[in-house]
């Protein structure tokens, strides 16, 4: 396994719409394994393939167990996700490995039902609420070329852009 480079905002790669996975083979398995190592190394709870510059509809979610401990047992590998139902709303603070060091409150559906495939091509249907629901929506947004900051209202979005420019200037000085 290898730790992959994470593509960060404002890289245009993140705006690409990811293509459906057609082959459930060893190359996909290696990518998923590398993505998991990358996500864990970077303290993430989710990672979409496009975030490592691979434009396919594959993502990982690991919100951990009841104590927040992440492991392969709590990992959900999601290929070609499709939302079947959604309802309710919730606001939660989100962050993103592609937008490092920025967090803000985003409104999402509270409950979702998602159909997807695992690494072997087996179909699954899962109902999710709370953080898991947020993670499914956040990571699937990546597959559609969107970042969580696009869901911010106008004032918060302008604040983000200003803070992000300042952060980039600070990083360049180092």
Curated annotation (Swiss-Prot):
EC number: 3.5.1.88
Keywords for the protein's UniProt record, in alphabetical order: Hydrolase, Iron, Metal-binding, Protein biosynthesis
Active site (catalytic residues): 139
Catalytic activity entry: N-terminal N-formyl-L-methionyl-[peptide] + H2O = N-terminal L-methionyl-[peptide] + formate
Pfam families: Pep_deformylase
Positions of Fe cation binding: 96, 138, 142
InterPro entries reported in the protein's UniProt record: Peptide_deformylase (IPR023635), Peptide_deformylase_sf (IPR036821)
Name recorded for this polypeptide: Peptide deformylase
Species of origin: Nautilia profundicola (strain ATCC BAA-1463 / DSM 18972 / AmH)
């Amino acid at each position: 396994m290898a730790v992959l480079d994470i593509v960060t905002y404002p890289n245009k790669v993140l705006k690409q719409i990811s293509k459906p996975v057609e082959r459930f083979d060893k190359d996909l398995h290696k990518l998923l394994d590398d993505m998991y190592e990358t996500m864990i190394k970077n303290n993430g709870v989710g990672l979409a393939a496009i975030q490592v510059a691979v434009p396919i509809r594959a993502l990982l979610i690991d919100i951990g167990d009841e104590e927040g401990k992440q492991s392969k047992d709590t990992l959900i590998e999601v290929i070609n996700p499709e939302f079947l139902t959604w309802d309710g709303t919730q606001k939660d603070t989100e962050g993103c490995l592609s937008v490092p060091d920025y967090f803000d409150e985003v409104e999402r559906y509270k409950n979702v039902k998602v159909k997807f495939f695992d690494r072997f091509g087996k179909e699954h249907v899962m109902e999710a609420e709370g953080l898991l629901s947020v993670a499914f929506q956040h990571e699937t947004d990546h597959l559609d070329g969107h970042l969580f900051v696009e869901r911010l209202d106008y004032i918060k979005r302008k604040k983000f852009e200003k803070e992000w420019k300042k952060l980039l200037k600070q990083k360049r000085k180092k």
